[in-house]
From Swiss-Prot:
GO biological process per UniProt: leading strand elongation; regulation of DNA replication
Organism domain of life: Viruses
Keyword Secreted attached: no
Residues spanning the membrane: none
Gene3D superfamilies, per database record: 3.70.10.10
Residue ranges of the region described as Disordered: 1-21
Source organism: Acanthamoeba polyphaga mimivirus
Protein name: Uncharacterized protein L823
Lineage: Viruses, Varidnaviria, Bamfordvirae, Nucleocytoviricota, Megaviricetes
Lipidation (N-myristoyl glycine): G2
Keywords from the UniProt entry: Lipoprotein, Myristate
GO molecular function, one term: DNA binding
Length: 323
């Protein structure tokens, strides 16, 4: 079984080929913007902003600190924990890239599984949070995921506390991330997370012109994968210009699901085998009503792309294997 990913310092092919609506999978940062405001934020002075919290549509006053080069405000503790669980499917130590770009900034995570057969890219929009400020074009922080989970447990255990959590980095201490919250008694709780040494990750994301695109409901695809998983470790995906089938071999029987599709296979059939467990790990992070896109090409990593709540997008690359 070959690996399509490497952490060696090799540059990926920067060709002009498109990827059938997934050009955003491989992108470069081409500039910065000076000011970042997310929807629902009214600036009342240089450092005081009134935020309308997305959780309960209630306004709250937040004072930004000039000493902070990074500030993220959110009441969505459950989403933060979901992010940790998602990344934890691949690794226990993650490098976050906080970026100051157009449309409110973003956070990017690109991590490779230890077996080098699954690559996860998570893109979170700054506008998904109640407030997002990144004073540099890019800030990198490598953190141990269990440390973050423990910190959220320490200051997020009180379900009656509706105050938001603040994630920040100080200008004079770029070696730590701070998680802060005011409790119901007015006391400030803060946990300092030491950043681990950042590594110069150069994981080239597979880039190609895909031959087919499958659009399917996330819940439907999850059920198909679960049923196939009950009889086999492998799933075979076969694609023609009119139809896709998901199948598995069970003793002398072929177990198959079919789905109509528009693709660019043009009279040929594409067949690839994948480990079903690698897909099931990530499908559960999509909401049942989500539509996901599956991009496929013969002997090339499968790409599953879909929304992550209202925070951004998930891209999962999984390598094909020999039957």
């Amino acid at each position: 079984m070959g690996s399509y990913y490497s952490t060696e310092s090799t540059k990926s092919n920067e060709s002009n080929e498109t990827t059938n609506n997934v050009e955003g999978i491989v992108d470069t940062i081409g500039g910065t913007v000076e000011s970042i405001n997310s929807d629902g934020i009214i600036t009342t002075s240089e450092n005081i902003v009134e935020i309308v919290l997305k959780e309960n549509n209630q306004p709250t006053i937040f004072e930004t600190q000039e000493s902070n080069i990074l500030e993220i405000v959110t009441t969505k503790i459950d989403v933060l924990k979901k992010i940790l669980r998602l990344i934890g499917e691949v690794t226990s130590e993650c490098q976050f890239s906080f970026q100051n770009v157009n449309e409110g900034g973003r956070i990017i995570v690109t991590e490779l599984h230890d077996n080098k057969t699954i690559l996860l890219k998570l893109v979170l929009k700054g506008t998904g949070f109640d407030f997002y400020k990144c004073s540099k074009s890019k800030i990198t922080a490598r953190l141990y995921l269990p440390d973050i989970d423990e910190a959220l447990g320490l200051i997020g255990v009180d379900d009656t506390n509706t105050n938001p959590i603040i994630i920040s980095m100080k200008k004079d201490k770029e070696t730590s991330i701070f998680i802060t919250r005011i409790d119901n008694s007015g006391f400030t709780e803060q946990v300092e997370l030491p950043c681990r040494e950042s590594v110069g990750l150069n994981i080239p994301l597979p880039k190609t012109t895909f031959q087919g695109k499958i659009v399917i409901n996330a819940e439907k695809f999850r059920k198909i994968c679960e049923r196939i998983c009950s009889v086999s470790d492998l799933i075979k995906i076969s694609l023609t210009d009119k139809e896709v089938s998901f199948s598995a071999r069970y003793y002398n029987l072929d177990f198959r699901y079919k789905h109509s599709v528009e693709s660019k296979v043009l009279g040929q059939t594409i067949e690839n085998y994948f480990f079903i467990d690698g897909m099931l790990k990530f499908i559960k992070y999509f909401q049942s009503s989500d539509e996901i896109s599956i991009y496929i090409k013969k002997d090339f990593p499968l790409v599953i792309h879909g929304p992550f709540d209202n925070f951004g997008s998930i891209y999962v690359f999984t390598s094909p294997i020999e039957e």
